[in-house]
Amino acid sequence: MKRPVDFYAMKESGEKITMITAYDYPSAKNVEQAAADMILVGDSLGMVVLGYDSTVPVTIDDMIHHTKAVKRGAPNTFVVTDMPFMTYHGSVDETIQNARQIIQESGAHAVKLEGAGEVVNKIARLTEAGAPVVAHLGLTPQSVGLTGSYKVRAKSVQEAQELIDNALAVEAAGAIAIVLEAIPRQLAEKVTKALTIPTIGIGAGVETDGQVLVYHDIIGYGISRRAKFVKAYADIDETIEPALTSYVKEVKEQTFPEVKHSFTMAEEDLKGLYGRE
């Protein structure tokens, strides 16, 4: 299993880091079999697998539950777990307690926090306490309720400079890596070159040190539309729907199950059960 020191070495050598967001045992198992470097258990599970319209309702217990499943499916892969909405915006002590609970109960190797500002101090204190932290800048889904959209961030000079400053701040605070989401590729390249820690891009161009996409987006499973930055590697939904429809139809028509799908009992045992005729 790769560790932060390995990710630093990969950045240094130019080898790209692969991260996939997964939420359960079978998807994590697939990800590990594909030899991805990291798994992110994102609070996006709220929308992708729990059916919420945002990440806001996701709880610590949700994150622990899904991370434990991921760990069982990918025991040899570095796992990062999101700290959900408002679990790191109270006191430092509350933040440390919440991170401790996630790491101890789920087995996550690191936690991810969105944003900068007051979050920078939380990253520093978590690092001091021994909890590895991945930062997340650019489009931060937990704050969409305030910003009102999932549009590209940091397109103006002022916003771009602020993002660069924030990236340097979270690095100085001890973050082991930074997710850069939905920012101009030129800015992502500048940030990547300015930092000694790895950058993991999603909708941030090719020059970041690594890339992350959601498992469901990659394989086309249960999604209504793909974002611009998502490449369609498969479309599993096209296979799933007709398969389920065929099953329902065959049961109704009594063409499933066939004899070959059934178990049998020896004739002698049947006679013993029902009596000899």
From Swiss-Prot:
Write down the EC number.
Answer: 2.1.2.11
Q: Does the keyword Transport apply?
A: no
Keyword check for Cytoplasm: yes
A GO biological process held by the record: pantothenate biosynthetic process
User: Main location per UniProt?
Assistant: cytoplasm
| Cofactor(s), by name | Mg(2+)
What does the record's cofactor remark say about binding? Binds 1 Mg(2+) ion per subunit.
What Gene3D superfamilies does this protein map onto? Phosphoenolpyruvate-binding domains
Q: Which family does it belong to?
A: Belongs to the PanB family.
Q: Output the PANTHER family linked to this UniProt entry.
A: 3-METHYL-2-OXOBUTANOATE HYDROXYMETHYLTRANSFERASE
The protein's name: 3-methyl-2-oxobutanoate hydroxymethyltransferase
What organism is the protein native to? Listeria welshimeri serovar 6b (strain ATCC 35897 / DSM 20650 / CCUG 15529 / CIP 8149 / NCTC 11857 / SLCC 5334 / V8)
Q: What is the lineage of its organism?
A: Bacteria, Bacillati, Bacillota, Bacilli, Bacillales
